[in-house]
């Protein structure tokens, strides 16, 4: 659904204003990791529930209930992993540019996976699964598990 992807791409970070990310000009009170859940709440109130799920599920490469508990994240304990192809596409595309460098540097696959692996190897596996799904290039870092079955 191309129209939905475009709309969701514009809206997926709407919750960032509720977070405290001074480097991004955000003076809210919540940790940055909460921007997806906050975005979902905003869009749900506007009747845009499907778009809200994109907000909630794009953070990192999705966050499972297990990871929320294990890492003591200030998030609801539920799986927030992208499920639809549209959710997965926005999650994938979101990893290539950072808000902190004014979007001037497109990250490589290696940079993205290294950054995600700092948090948990499963995150890098999930990203590589997305890369296989959306890339036309052969996967240069074939990994065993897809990362989606957890």
Where is each model-derived feature located?
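Charged phosphate-binding loop/patch that engages nucleotide di/tri-phosphates or the phosphate backbone
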Residues: 118-150
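Divalent metal-dependent catalytic cores for phosphoryl transfer on phosphate-bearing substrates
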Residues: 1-110
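C-terminal/domain-terminus segments
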Residues: 104-126
